Amino acid sequence: VRTLTMKFGGTSVGNAHAVSQAADIALDCSQEWERVVVVVSAASGVTDSLTQGALTAASGDGQTYLDIEADLRARHYAVVRELVSSPGGSASLLAMVDEHLAELAAFCRSIHVLGEVTPRAMDTIVSVGERMNAGILAALLRQRGKKSQAVDATQLIVTDTAFQKAVPLMDSTRTRVAERLVPMLADGIVPVVTGFIGA
C-alpha cells in the first residue's frame, strides 16, 4: 500500500491562508494516494517566540512570556476564526489553543521561579506551536470532508533521554507506528503529526 508523507514547514502554515492551502494540498493528494500522513510545524516565528519566552523567564523576566502567550493566543485565534465555520468546532479549537498556552505559561512560571530552564522543559515548550497547528489543520481537513486526527509525535516516536538532541529508537518507534498510526491509515484517516518532538 502506497503512503505519502507530506511535511509542511513554518511558512507553509504561517497564517490562515497558508493553512488553508496546506489543507487543499493534503486533500488533493488524498485523492491520488491510498494513505496520506501530514507532518506539520509551528507557524513561522512561533518556535523562536516560545524559546524566547522560556529563556527570558529563566533570566528573571516575568513579563515577556506573558506577552508572548497573549500574542500567540491572538494569532492562533485569528486563524481558527477565519478557517473553522462551525461554532462547536471553533470553540473546541479555541479551547485547545488555551490549553496549550496555559501549559506554556505554567512551565514559564516555574522556570521564572527556579531561574533555569531544563532541556526537557525546553523540548516541551518549543513543541507547543506545532501541537496547536496540528489540531487546527486536522479540524480544517474534517471540515472539508476528510477524516483526520491530530497526532502528537510523542505517541509514535520513541527516543533516548538526551533532551534537545534526542536520537530516535527505531525498533520501538516502528512498533508504536504499527500499533497507532497504521490502524488510522487503514481506516482512511489522515493523521496530522507534530513535526519536532518524540518521547
Locations of the language-model features?
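Nucleotide/pyrophosphate-binding catalytic subdomain
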Residues: V1-A199
